[in-house]
């Protein structure tokens, strides 16, 4: 593969280096092309003389690197190279690492990819005496070759049908779908199961939900989901005011909603009063504080 070796016209110190002179002798033997440039137009003319997959630039110091290969220069030089070309910059003596970092950054900003700094590794031999080699590549693809992916996207199929949307609050946990009351039940179903049995209580509660006769036993239903119990039939509905009429959907998501009257539950602590009868039939009332709670619909 033919390579292009170029130097800058003003870099006289490079020709005094024995390392570079040995590189020139190698170029003559391998029939690589050599040229000098003083401006971007000269460099463009040299590159266009042939198809070079590798363009190698030799510099005597990093100071020339910062003076010549500016961002504007590299941006124009990027357009001169063929797609897939490799650029290598060989520096004989490095005087400032900051200039090398700035050069690498300008290479990336100009469009080059795979920018690497190979310290102590020359272009064609591992025992090269060049202090640093910077390698970069011009992409093998053109920007206009990109494919527009929007043509492959099925917009109609990617957007769900609005008819299949699940209304807010549906799918929440509900007592209607359960065989028994929750372990921490506070809606009254657990007490109802103790009185009339599990199956009978389930039917009663289901009927209350479907007919809209359910009543709050915790007093928190109107506050919103953050205060409602897990089996609350009002789960998923917005908060409302006590005594306000609200639309309550059953647990199956039936469209036939029911209007129910939401009553506020008031709780008061009560004492247990027992009466003890003597032999003569007279009774004595005993008051015991059990900390019980009486729930009333207001």
Curated annotation (Swiss-Prot):
Residue positions binding [4Fe-4S] cluster: 218, 221, 229, 232
Fe-S binding site A: region residues: 175-187
Region (Linker): 143-162
Keyword Zinc: no
Protein localization: Cytoplasm; Mitochondrion intermembrane space
Chief location: cytoplasm
Region named Fe-S binding site B: 218-232
Family matches, as InterPro entries: Anamorsin (IPR007785), CIAPIN1 (IPR046408)
Cofactor: [2Fe-2S] cluster; [4Fe-4S] cluster
Pfam family, one: CIAPIN1
Binding site for [2Fe-2S] cluster: 175, 182, 185, 187
GO biological process: iron-sulfur cluster assembly
GO molecular function, one term: 2 iron, 2 sulfur cluster binding
Chain positions of motif Cx2C motif 2: 229-232
Keywords: 2Fe-2S, 4Fe-4S, Cytoplasm, Iron, Iron-sulfur, Metal-binding, Mitochondrion
Keyword Metal-binding among UniProt keywords: yes
Record motif Cx2C motif 1, residues: 218-221
Region of interest: N-terminal SAM-like domain: 1-143
Any one cellular-component term (Gene Ontology): mitochondrial intermembrane space
Assigned protein family: Belongs to the anamorsin family.
Comment field on protein domains: The C-terminal domain binds 2 Fe-S clusters but is otherwise mostly in an intrinsically disordered conformation. The N-terminal domain has structural similarity with S-adenosyl-L-methionine-dependent methyltransferases, but does not bind S-adenosyl-L-methionine. It is required for correct assembly of the 2 Fe-S clusters.
Subunit details: Monomer.
Functional description taken from the UniProt entry: Component of the cytosolic iron-sulfur (Fe-S) protein assembly (CIA) machinery. Required for the maturation of extramitochondrial Fe-S proteins. Part of an electron transfer chain functioning in an early step of cytosolic Fe-S biogenesis, facilitating the de novo assembly of a [4Fe-4S] cluster on the cytosolic Fe-S scaffold complex. Electrons are transferred from NADPH via a FAD- and FMN-containing diflavin oxidoreductase.
HAMAP family listed in its UniProt record: Anamorsin (MF_03115)
Protein name (database record): Anamorsin homolog
Source organism of this protein record: Cryptosporidium parvum (strain Iowa II)
């Amino acid at each position: 593969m033919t390579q292009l070796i170029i130097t800058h016209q003003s870099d006289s110190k490079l020709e005094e280096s024995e390392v570079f002179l040995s590189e020139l002798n190698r170029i003559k033997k391998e029939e690589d092309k050599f040229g000098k440039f003083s401006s971007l137009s000269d460099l463009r003319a040299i590159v266009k003389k042939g198809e070079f997959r590798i363009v190698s630039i030799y510099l005597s110091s990093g100071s020339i690197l910062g003076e010549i290969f500016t961002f504007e220069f590299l941006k124009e030089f990027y357009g001169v190279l063929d797609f897939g070309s490799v650029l290598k910059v060989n520096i004989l003596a490095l005087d400032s690492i900051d200039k090398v970092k700035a050069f690498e950054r300008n290479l990336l900003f100009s469009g080059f990819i795979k920018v690497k700094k190979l310290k102590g590794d020359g272009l064609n031999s591992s025992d090269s005496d060049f202090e640093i080699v910077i390698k970069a590549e011009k992409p093998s693809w053109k920007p206009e070759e990109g494919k527009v992916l929007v043509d492959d996207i099925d917009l109609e199929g990617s957007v769900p049908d609005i008819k299949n949307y699940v209304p807010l609050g549906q799918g929440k946990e509900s007592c209607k779908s359960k065989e028994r009351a929750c372990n921490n039940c506070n809606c009254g179903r657990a007490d109802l199961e103790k009185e009339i049995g599990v199956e009978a209580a389930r039917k009663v509660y289901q009927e209350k939900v479907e007919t809209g006769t359910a009543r709050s036993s915790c007093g928190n239903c109107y506050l919103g989901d953050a205060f409602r119990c897990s089996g609350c039939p009002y789960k998923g509905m917005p908060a409302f005011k006590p005594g306000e009429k609200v639309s309550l959907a059953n647990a199956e998501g039936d469209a036939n909603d029911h209007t129910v009257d939401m009553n506020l539950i008031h709780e008061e602590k009560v004492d247990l009063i027992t009466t003890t009868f003597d032999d003569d039939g007279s009774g004595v009332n005993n008051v015991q504080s059990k900390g019980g709670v009486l729930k009333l619909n207001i």
